[in-house]
Amino acid sequence: MNVYDIRMAPYWFYEGRGLVQHPYVFRQPVSSRAIIVSTRGDVTGDGVIDEVFLTGNQMPGSPLWRNITLVIRDGRTHQEQRIQLQNNMGYNPSLFLGDMTGDKIEDVAVVMDTGGSGGAIYAYVFAYLNRQFRRIFNSDVLNDELKYSVRYQNQYKASVISHQQNETYILDLTYKGREYLNEIYNSQGVLKMPIEGWVNPLSGLYPVDFDRDGVYELLAYQRIAGRYNADSLGYVQTVLKWNGQRFMFNRQTVTIFGSDLS
């Protein structure tokens, strides 16, 4: 083995029940698990700091991670628990620790980019309940629950209907500019033909302590698309709050992009 080969470098691997650093290892595709990201916090509620990290396999030269697994090492017993993710392949995996259930114990949020169109993400939250980790949030479930209808209307407007919330939002499209509007409206502001858009799956999930009480709510972002996916009309923002059993809808708003004053 040529230790001076530029493809050799110190590399951390997850092997068995711990981490091993091999000073010179040829990085073969999907050969061993590597630590993607790690953090520390008391996620079991025993007052002892635990280690939390994501492991996975990465192809050389690719930002895509495969076989992503959540690993929690108990700070008191040093035992490890591995949690398989429903969707275990993605980009830019991240970890966040914070109390999202109000029990004074830090919960674990995992978010990663899918790499698909629309900037969609996979997101999960795990909590230590009844002496074991349970998944209490799944972005796929929320995407299935949130249903919308997006329709362009006369006079340079678009409506977004949130069926789950039973609410309608009206978007002012004049900020899109005259060239955009002339393509779909006549000189009287009447649609030349019916146009429907859609709301993309979750593109962001952010723990935010809105009430400043030490308990994080979840702020979910979904992008509103118009005639095509890159034709963004704004975002649906949904705040989710833990009710003791699950995350419930707390409130929902729609935001639009501003226009240039010049």
Swiss-Prot record:
* Superkingdom of origin: Bacteria
Question: What's the protein called, per UniProt?
Answer: Uncharacterized protein YybI
**InterPro entries the record matches:** Integrin_alpha_N (IPR028994)
Which gene is the coding source of this polypeptide chain? yybI
Q: Which organism is it from?
A: Bacillus subtilis (strain 168)
